[in-house]
UniProtKB/Swiss-Prot annotation:
Keyword Transmembrane helix set for record: no
Source organism superkingdom: Bacteria
GO biological-process terms attached to the record: histidyl-tRNA aminoacylation; L-histidine biosynthetic process
Gene3D superfamilies from the UniProt entry: Bira Bifunctional Protein, Domain 2 (3.30.930.10)
Primary localization: cytoplasm
Its biological purpose: Required for the first step of histidine biosynthesis. May allow the feedback regulation of ATP phosphoribosyltransferase activity by histidine.
Location(s), subcellular: Cytoplasm
Gene source species: Lacticaseibacillus casei (strain BL23) (Lactobacillus casei)
Encoding gene per record: hisZ
GO molecular function: catalytic activity, acting on a protein; histidine-tRNA ligase activity; transferase activity
Pfam families given in the database record: tRNA-synt_His
Annotated protein name in UniProt: ATP phosphoribosyltransferase regulatory subunit
Alphabetic keyword roster: Amino-acid biosynthesis, Cytoplasm, Histidine biosynthesis
Keyword Cytoplasm appears in the UniProt entry: yes
Length: 382
């Protein structure tokens, strides 16, 4: 194995992109702090069992053994460690936390994606109110507005919509599993065969249209009102409708869509979930939702929770570089160190020229197309 190559799925970060990424992290962190969230940080290494509830198709964590022979992993997720933290300490919810850190997932070769991803997000644990979802979405909207991210589409869904329809259809477990598999995989011919025996069911017109129920929120709600009984709309869809109204009031620049055909990101999601992307983008800029089963793997008492996570790398790629400013070198004699440092502090894009002679300083400035500020009265023997 070469010592000159990086492992597949990793990269070095430097230059303008690294600066954009670091500035972005600072911007998001300050937003969370100003909103009253408390900082939380968990270890990079966790026991493998912490992530049992995590289901990410085609991805595996980096895994190793500790000195006791226990399986530990580099965290593939930042939410479950917070559930572990809450269940093993005397912290009393509700809590409002914010975090920033890297996650690691070994993805398929040639997938074109990276195994190391930086995330920044918030967790509101102990809140049942729909206001918790709104708080997450509000923070996300304000951050995107601050960053100047326009042409943003926010897609909303509900983790319990499919289960509720299946319960209404009164399918047995085997039939329900087959139905969900075909539906989420978009296997339309199989799906049509599965709904054919339900032709006399009052929901059959809805079932025929269901695979295409995604898009503009007003259009989808109008279709649902036409196709579904009123009690389903009231019970399951009212929170979605209220959330769409909230977003249109608070963030009229957002394009809000509904997708009632998508699988929840994880099995522990229990309500509204969401993600956002820009036109032409191939990655979600942020995502999140409600997961009231978050603590199911750690304790019997379940706690309501809502979370939001920004993909820092995806957002970084959407941000422009800062306007180019010419580099300036400041050169001075050793006795002028303090004066040179003061000049650097007050000169845009300046740095100390760490060479011994004026000739070397001039050569360095020429090589990097930089300006040169010479503080030395004359060349001297050092």
């Amino acid at each position: 194995m070469s010592n000159r190559h990086l492992p597949i799925g990793t990269r070095d970060e430097f230059g303008p992109r690294a600066i954009r990424k670091e500035n972005l992290i600072q911007t998001i962190s300050q937003q969370f702090i100003q909103a009253g969230f408390e900082r939380v940080k968990t270890p990079l290494l966790e026991y493998r069992d912490v992530f049992k509830p995590l289901a990410v198709s085609g991805e595996q964590p980096y895994q190793m053994l500790d000195d006791a022979g226990e399986s530990v992993v580099m965290r593939p997720d930042l939410t479950l460690p917070l559930a572990r933290l809450l269940s093993t300490t005397s912290i009393v919810p509700p809590v409002q936390w914010w975090y920033v850190g890297d996650i690691f997932r070994v993805k398929k070769s040639l997938s074109g994606t990276y195994n190391q991803i930086t995330q920044a997000g918030i967790e509101l644990i102990g809140y049942r109110s729909l206001k918790a979802e709104w708080a997450c979405l509000s923070e996300a909207g304000k951050i995107c507005r601050t960053l100047g991210l326009t042409h943003l589409t926010l897609e909303l869904s509900d983790a319990q919509f499919v289960p509720q329809i299946l319960r209404t259809l009164q399918l047995n477990d085997a039939a329900a599993d087959a139905f969900q598999t075909a539906f989420f995989a978009k296997e339309l011919s199989t799906y049509q065969n599965l709904i054919a025996p339900l032709a006399t069911n009052p929901l059959y017109p809805f079932l025929q249209q269901w695979p295409w129920l995604f898009g503009d929120s007003e259009t989808i709600f109008a279709e649902l009102k036409r196709l579904l009984p009123s009690n389903v709309i009231t019970d399951r869809l009212a929170p979605l409708q209220q959330t769409v109204a909230f977003l249109k009031d608070q963030f009229p620049e957002l394009r809000v869509t509904i997708d009632l055909t998508s699988r929840p990101p994880q099995s522990y999601y229990t309500g509204i979930f969401f993600h956002a992307y820009v036109d032409g983008g191939h990655q979600y800029l942020f995502s999140g939702g409600r997961y009231d089963k978050l603590l199911a793997s750690f304790q019997q008492e379940l706690l309501p929770a809502v979370g939001l996570a920004f993909d820092i790398d995806a957002v970084t790629d959407q941000l422009p570089n800062a306007p180019d400013q010419p580099l300036t070198f400041v050169y001075g004699l050793p006795s002028q160190w303090q004066a040179a440092a003061a000049m650097v502090a007050t000169t845009p894009n300046a740095r100390l020229c760490l060479v011994d002679t004026l000739a070397e300083a001039q050569a360095a400035a020429t090589k990097q197309h930089a300006n040169l500020i010479d503080l030395s009265p004359k060349e001297a023997i050092l």
